[in-house]
Structures are given as structure tokens and as C-alpha cells.
Amino acid sequence: MALGFIKKVFSFGKDKAETEERPQEDAALERGNENASFEAALSDAEAHDAVDKDPVSELEMETAGGPAADEAVDVAPAEDDEEEDAPLLPGAELSGDMGLVPLSLLQAEAAAEEQGEPLPEPLDAGLDADAMDALLNEAEAASAVESPAIPPVLPKGFSSAREREEPVPVAPQVKLTWFQRLRAGLARTSSQLTTQISALFTKRKLDEDTLDELEDLLIQSDLGVETAMRITGALSSERYGKDVSGEDVARIMAGEITKVLKPVAKPLELDLSHKPHVILVVGVNGTGKTTTIGKLAAKLSGSGLKVMLAAGDTFRAAAIEQLKIWADRTGSEFIGTKLGADAAGLAYDAYEQARAQKSDVLIIDTAGRLQNKTELMAELEKIVRVLGKLDPDAPHTVLQTLDATTGQNAMNQVEIFRNVAGVSGLIMTKLDGTARGGILVAIAAKHKLPVYFIGVGEGVEDLEPFEAEDFAKAIAGV
């Protein structure tokens, strides 16, 4: 193949048809002896005399090796290139001196010519640098789009995590009204009452036996003996000897409970002529004293009053920190002490600072204590005495928090704390759980203490003024 190429280089004037009529056997023979004949032909070409001494025609001289390095070559316009005959070797005019063309390129061109297949035109022929960059960028972009990412093969002992599924967007929950949240909190008491009452009066007329059974049901629901007797008495006077439905009982029950609760549903009065107005918050462990104080502070400071919070629960570090967070959140002043310090001494310091800073309201937290712990109840008495020495009317308000889930135990708590600390009002908390809210009716009927607020959640807006009629309807399921 190489030998045939060398012959072509030095025989440009000969008829091209002669090379095409060569037998295929000679071509195959030449290809078989390619390695041996090529080296010999190359040696002969290198040993050949200079080009200017060869007996070649002027036309061969002009086309064999290209222009000399020191001679200018006129480039014909692009339109004339199409009319001229194509050079014998494609790309020869771009390669400069034939002696500088790599041997591999010469071999490839000669082999392609022998097989009758034209070599493809070089991609960079006639393209400037910008066009070439554009082509390369398009090729890279196409390969990036078309070639899918092949995940790596992990070694033994490893596994690929599954693709995480996109979370399904959760539709925002519709915020319940206050009455809806109250009804949900009292659902336990209400559902038990309505179910049992409906079963009691199925296909029965109202008589003494059914009245006694109804009274037992009401007492078991923590409504208290007094309230149960009021309900059965009102029902007897209206429907005795007649058929009674569950709706009739619920309507009468809601009305009687409202009558019991209305006298105690009062707003919390603040005497701002006393600066500060001192509110002492008491209660057993876990009734939500600290959270209730934070909610009260949010309401008062939101109304423009200057509030100070005192961390009187010196037995729990968490209580001190929690009250500090509420103070920061509500923009209230805060005073605390070290863990285990005297709570009465803290109350004294808190009152002095509140008076010096002209605070409108001072709310003092206290440690949770069981009503049967004599020493803790004595400490509570000491706090009340110390505040009384600073101001004969202090504490001006003593609030007791009640857990709505405790049932009858709340009745005993009110009685003892009222005797020790002089409780002046109640706040019922945790009505958002499995509440047994009927006990509030029994406490109101017995102690006649004002019920200022009830809580149905952890948020500030979940502490609302007590409304007797709403509470009664929620219990009765009306």
C-alpha cells in the first residue's frame, strides 16, 4: 500500500485510469508485503535526489510539495474552488510540505484511495475558533442530556438508600372556635352522659326509679350531689309520668348547670391603685401554674400594662427557666433566685423591685405542693404573711389552678388551699385532654368561688374567660 502511494506521489502526470485497472490480486499482494516494502520504499525516497534535480514537469513541481516557505501564495476566492479539480490527496493543500506529513496519515490516505472510499472532510476545515467552540459545546450539552446518570456500584456490605418520596402537602387545618375546642375537651363527660341517659329513657316513662337512676349517673359524672338533685327536680316537675327523650334531659341539664355556674363566672378584677397589684398563683404539682402565669402575662402586657414575673418555685430549675422564657416572650420583667432559696425571701425582693419600677402587676409563681404536705403548706403561709407585711392587702388575688383531669380530688385541693392561702378564684386547666369537667360544677355549687379562666391548650389564645352557658352546653352535649 505504501509503495503504491510513493509511486503516485512521483507520477502525477500519468493517466489515473491505469491505477484503477490494477488487478485486485496485486493490491492484496502489496498489502500483504506492506511492512517490508514500505521501509524499502521510504529509504529510496529519502535517498532520492533533490526535487529540483528530478526530471519532473513544471505542473508536478507546482503541485507536489506545496509552496515554498518564503513564497507568497495567492488564495483563490471560494467561488472558484468549486470549479477547480479536487487535489489528488484530500487535505494536501492544508498540510504544507509533504515531507512533514505524519506517516500514519499517509498510510490512511493511501489505503482509503485504493479501496475507492473518499476520506471524510476534516471537521475543522474552513471553521474558525468560535465555530469550533460552539460545536464542542453543543456536543457536550447533547451528551449530558442524552446520557443517563449511571449509579455507582457499591462494594459488598453497602446498599443504596431508596429515593425519598416527596412528602404529600398537608392541607392546613381549620382552626376551631373557642366553643368547638371546649366541646372537644369536654367530650368525655358529655359522651358518657348522653349515651347512658339515652339508654336509660328508651321506651320508659319518667318515674321515681328512672329519676333515681338518672341522679346516680349525674353524680358519677362529677357534677356533684347538689347539681344532680337540681337536674332531677327540674326534670320531674316538667316531664313526670310522661315519655322522656335524651334531648329533653340534655336541654334541662344544660339549663340547670348554667344556673349553677353563672354566679361564679366573673372577670378577674385588678385594683391598679395598688402598684403593684400582686397575684399569687398556687396549686398542686402538674396543674399548669407556670404556663398559666405566662398566658396571663401575655394578656396583660399586650394591653399595655407593665408586668413583673417572680420565680417563686425554687425547687425546680426547669420552672425558673420556663418562667424566664415567658418573661422574655411577653416583654415582662423577671426576677429569680438560686435553686433551693427561700421562696418567701424571693417574694419580698420581687415586691420591692416591682414597686421601685412602678410595675402595674406582679405575678408570683409558687412550688407545686400536695395538700397533705404540712411543711410545704406552712411555707405557702409564710409567703402570704411576708407579702401582708409589705402591703396589708397583699396578695390582692390568690389564684388556684385546677387540673380538669383529676376529678373529685380537685374538690379536696380547693378546700385546703382556700384555708391556707385564702384562694380567691380558680382557673381550670387541661380541658383539652381527657377532661372530667363536671367537677367544676360541683366546686362552684359548694364553694361559690369565682372561676376566672379555663384553658384548652398550650397557646396563649387557649386561655379564655369562663363562660357559664358555653360550658354547660358543652357538658350536656347540646
Curated annotation (Swiss-Prot):
Keywords: Cell inner membrane, Cell membrane, Cytoplasm, GTP-binding, Hydrolase, Membrane, Nucleotide-binding, Receptor
Compositionally biased spans, kind Acidic residues: 71-86
Any one cellular-component term (Gene Ontology): plasma membrane
Primary localization: membrane
A GO BP annotation: SRP-dependent cotranslational protein targeting to membrane
Protein's UniProt keywords contain Transcription: no
Comp. bias (Basic and acidic residues): 14-33, 45-56
EC numbers on record: 3.6.5.4
Binding site for GTP: 283-290, 365-369, 429-432
Region (Disordered): 14-94
PANTHER family: SIGNAL RECOGNITION PARTICLE RECEPTOR SUBUNIT ALPHA (PTHR43134:SF1)
Function: Involved in targeting and insertion of nascent membrane proteins into the cytoplasmic membrane. Acts as a receptor for the complex formed by the signal recognition particle (SRP) and the ribosome-nascent chain (RNC). Interaction with SRP-RNC leads to the transfer of the RNC complex to the Sec translocase for insertion into the membrane, the hydrolysis of GTP by both Ffh and FtsY, and the dissociation of the SRP-FtsY complex into the individual components.
Protein name in UniProt: Signal recognition particle receptor FtsY
Species per Swiss-Prot/TrEMBL record: Agrobacterium fabrum (strain C58 / ATCC 33970) (Agrobacterium tumefaciens (strain C58))
